[in-house]
């Protein structure tokens, strides 16, 4: 099994990948280093595939990985509706990519980070 260590212990690496995956699901576009983006791409693709399946088992599998964070708050008929990242994954992103067979994200290179010249990229969902 090959993966990037990203200069962290295994628990730190898993936590970081969960955080970045959840942030990408919520914001649909984030700026990060190239190595992190390449590593998180595989986890995001797996989460979108679970979102496309949409059954109870897929929801439970995704819930073990995606953090329970608020994705959006809106007002409908005098009531406040709070949507979590998991709900966004299954209600918005899953149906959006229903016809697409993989390749849900793209990585675009940007200028290097100012402090240490690390290669920076934008990872986003394909429309």
Swiss-Prot record:
Q: Which GO terms describe its cellular component?
A: cytosolic large ribosomal subunit
InterPro entries tied to this protein: Ribosomal_bL17, Ribosomal_bL17_CS, Ribosomal_bL17_sf
Keywords from the UniProt entry: Ribonucleoprotein, Ribosomal protein
Query: At the top level of its lineage, which domain of life is listed?
Result: Bacteria
Task: Provide any one GO MF term from the record.
Answer: structural constituent of ribosome
Record-level GO BP terms: translation
**What do we know about how this protein assembles, alone or with others?**
Part of the 50S ribosomal subunit. Contacts protein L32.
Family note: Belongs to the bacterial ribosomal protein bL17 family.
The name this protein goes by in its record: Large ribosomal subunit protein bL17
**Which species does the entry assign this protein to?**
Enterococcus faecalis (strain ATCC 700802 / V583)
Organism lineage reads as: Bacteria, Bacillati, Bacillota, Bacilli, Lactobacillales
């Amino acid at each position: 099994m090959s993966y990037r260590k990203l200069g962290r212990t295994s628990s730190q690496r898993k936590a970081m990948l969960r955080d970045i995956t959840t942030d990408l699901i919520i914001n649909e576009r984030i700026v990060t280093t190239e190595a992190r983006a390449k590593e998180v791409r595989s986890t995001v693709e797996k989460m979108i595939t679970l979102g496309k399946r949409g059954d109870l088992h897929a929801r439970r599998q995704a819930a073990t990985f995606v953090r329970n964070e608020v994705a959006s708050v809106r007002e409908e008929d005098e009531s406040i509706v709070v949507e979590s990242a998991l709900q966004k994954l299954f209600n918005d992103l899953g149906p959006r990519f229903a016809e697409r067979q993989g390749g849900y994200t793209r990585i675009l290179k940007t200028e290097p980070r100012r402090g240490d010249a690390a290669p920076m990229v934008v990872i986003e969902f394909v429309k």
